[in-house]
A protein has these predicted regions:
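Active-site/ligand-binding-proximal alpha/beta "capping" segment
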Residues: 141, 148-182
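Short, flexible active-site-adjacent loop segments at beta-strand->alpha-helix junctions, enriched
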Residues: 72, 94, 116-120, 141, ...
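Short glycine/serine/threonine-biased micro-segments
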Residues: 38, 47, 141-144, 176
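Histidine/lysine/aspartate-rich catalytic loop segments that bind and position anionic ligands
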Residues: 116-153, 159
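Conserved N-terminal beta1-alpha1 strand-loop-helix module at the mouth
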Residues: 1-87, 95-97, 104-106, 112, ...
């Protein structure tokens, strides 16, 4: 079994303790900071705007794991300082410019992930498998922290891994997001 990586949700990190959290994350060799970008349109919440993310960049060198839960992700990705080796996920469900998003992220040197909601069939992603580094599977219905885990998503992740392996896509990573507490 492959070793997993942990990405801490900055949406859940209280601003009043941000330096404490970042110090703890650094000491624990945390691989990524999970940055949820929400526009209040694709999901019924607003989270982590450009100024907040710019400030985070100034105070930490931990790579970012962006998750764009927005309409028109191609436009909104350009608002952020996405760097080489950052992970960037955008949703399949509302995106008519998937190829353009993947090309944009490739030019930046970022790892491209396509995110899917609990009810979305992962087979829809097959046309993009040669162009992505990973698939982000939502294990909750997105929008707010603390939502209840959708139990069927655990099997979905297992089935997705088998599907990718069967296609010879063993290099494609699977990221899970939602109500994962350790």
């Amino acid at each position: 079994m492959k070793k997993g990586k942990i990405s801490a949700s900055m949406m859940c990190a209280g601003l009043d303790k941000i330096f404490y959290y970042l110090t703890e994350f650094k000491e624990a060799n945390l691989e990524f900071l999970h940055i949820d970008i929400m526009d209040g349109d694709f999901v019924p919440n607003l989270a982590l705007g450009t100024d907040y993310v710019k400030s985070l960049r100034r105070i930490t060198n931990i790579p970012f794991d962006y998750h764009f839960l927005v309409n028109n992700p191609l436009e909104k990705m350009s608002w952020f300082d996405i760097r080489e080796n950052d992970h960037v996920a955008f949703h399949y469900e509302n995106n008519k410019k998937i190829k353009e998003c993947l090309e944009f992220l490739k030019r930046l040197g970022a790892d491209s992930y396509i995110a899917i909601n609990p009810e979305t069939d992962y087979h829809f992603l097959e046309p993009y498998l040669n162009d992505i580094n990973g698939i982000l599977v939502m294990t909750v219905h997105p929008g707010f922290a603390g939502k209840k885990l959708v139990p069927s998503t655990i099997k979905k992740v297992e089935d997705l891994r088998k599907y990718l392996d069967k296609l010879g896509k063993t290099d494609i990573k699977i990221e899970v997001d939602g109500n994962i507490t350790i």
